[in-house]
Amino acid sequence: MEARGKVVGVIGNLVTIEVVGTVSMNEIVFIKTGGRSLKAEIIRIRDGEVDAQVFEMTRGIAVGDDIEFTNKLLTVELGPGLLSQVYDGLQNPLPELAAQCGFFLERGLYLSALDRKKKWHFNATAKVGDIVVAGDFLGFVIEGTIKHKIMIPFDRRDSYSIVEIVSDGDYTIDDKIAVVENDAGGKHIITMSFHWPVKIPITNYKERLIPSEPMVTQTRIIDTFFPVAKGGTFCIPGPFGAGKTVLQQVTSRNADVDIVIIAACGERAGEVVETLKEFPELIDPRTGKSLMERTCIICNTSSMPVAAREASVYTAITIGEYYRQMGLDILLLADSTSRWAQAMREMSGRLEEIPGEEAFPAYLESVIASFYERAGIVVLNDGSFGSVTVGGSVSPAGGNFEEPVTQATLKVVGAFHGLTRERSDARKFPAINPLESWSKYRGVVEFGKTEYARDFLAKGNEINQMMKVVGEEGISNGDFLVYLKSELLDSCYLQQNSFDSVDAAVNPERQNYMFDMLYDILQSDFKFESKLEARGFINELRQNILDMNLTPFKEEKFNKLEVSLKNLVRSKKLDFRGA
């Protein structure tokens, strides 16, 4: 029986609907009000009534308004044309919305996610008679700098034989590309695009692997001390203004991935505007073209309805999984998952559910875990590899890492990059605290060496705390030297100048080279007559290494600075291993 319904109650963006007929959980409905149709999602079903969260402002909705049931889940359209686009959480292209509406977007306006008029040059790789299943490739089109594979839709459950496939040429996303037939004789027309529900993971692959290969970000403190693996997960918690968004932008520019997807879910409008303005101007170091050519942005600012924040996170991860199915490496950056969790808390309160810690819903941990678990590296049907790496920033109030969202995130991620107010106020970038952060993945530098360096940083911090109480004169020369060496490692290796063309991105070879040099200095034993002499010597080393950081690797100036550094160290200690 076809469902019929009317509005019987409205609380904020939660609408209660009286229903006659059969409905399903997470079904999309349209509320007819004032000549508009507002999209909503059913989130609770009770006897004769359902509750739906509306993705728009609910002003004007009245008791008795009619409901249109779609019998479909919230889906995204997948196909050529997703890259370089800016979408809202419901996959409406924002530039086209702005062209139609001006500065203030209208309610109830939903546009096609993909350009239906643009023609793509299709190159067939399959042929008539081939046996295919969901996720298999029929051919490809060139989208920006990547080969966008045209696939059998993921919802096809049978094995099919190709009975017809078009020749190479230009086609729109709605044109027939192929006709496939199953064993029962049922034929299906395949086009370049199809829809997929955002809350259901795409699982059309042979095998899921354990992430092991490092995803090189070219940020020293991450790659060396707290690495992220391709197909892994990481989080960047930190107080407001600590540099989370900037660190994510630097990562997206330099990371060793094919495609970057940014989900700005609930960030302040000013930060989202900054991202939208900066990204088209950024040059991709790999291609020399605009970074936007391999980027897709899904944005819902904190001023937009809360329900759309949740949608934007799921839309982004689904698009990431789609490109993973082509054998590509994807990086998804969610900024910020705290605002998504706050949206869940708001909706949970309206549903009158029993609250958990700090009024967050009791199911907060399982929802966050289900999102991060969609990351991973997989073996596809043709034997190639694809990965989705997920990084979420968390904005705990006051930088308190003990709050529920941070704790729920820490239980499921593989790396933790904790930013602190103390380091950001000291103008240290990245402001990642080397003593609180951790990673379960393998980095670009040998693990034993990095552990030795971290122990050195911990000792240096202990001595620094002691000096705040007893002063420099209250500690031995040996302890003071340990403190100076830890500061040398911090300033010359853990910090980076993102505005310098050389120091902004450091490849693994250079990271290993510079770390070995510093590692030898940490292990060397120096003798000084006074603390003043020790400080002067370490300051000379620091300036020399900082100059090397700003100089292109292995060029003449770099080599001269290296010789100068070795001579300086040799003057105080003969067994310097870099000599």
Swiss-Prot record:
GO terms for molecular function: ATP binding; proton-transporting ATP synthase activity, rotational mechanism; proton-transporting ATPase activity, rotational mechanism. ATP binds at G238, P239, F240, G241, A242, G243, K244, T245. Its EC number is 7.1.2.2. It is an enzyme of class 7 (translocase). One of its GO terms (biological process) is proton motive force-driven plasma membrane ATP synthesis. It catalyses: ATP + H2O + 4 H(+)(in) = ADP + phosphate + 5 H(+)(out). InterPro entries: ATP-synt_VA_C, ATP-synth_a_Xtn, ATP_synth_asu-like_sf, ATPase_a/bsu_AS, ATPase_F1/V1/A1_a/bsu_N, ATPase_F1/V1/A1_a/bsu_nucl-bd, ATPase_F1/V1_b/a_C, P-loop_NTPase. Keywords: ATP synthesis, ATP-binding, Hydrogen ion transport, Ion transport, Nucleotide-binding, Translocase, Transport. Belongs to the ATPase alpha/beta chains family. Produces ATP from ADP in the presence of a proton gradient across the membrane. The V-type alpha chain is a catalytic subunit. PANTHER family: H(+)-TRANSPORTING TWO-SECTOR ATPASE, V-TYPE PROTON ATPASE CATALYTIC SUBUNIT A. This is V-type ATP synthase alpha chain. It comes from Borrelia hermsii (strain HS1 / DAH). The gene is atpA.
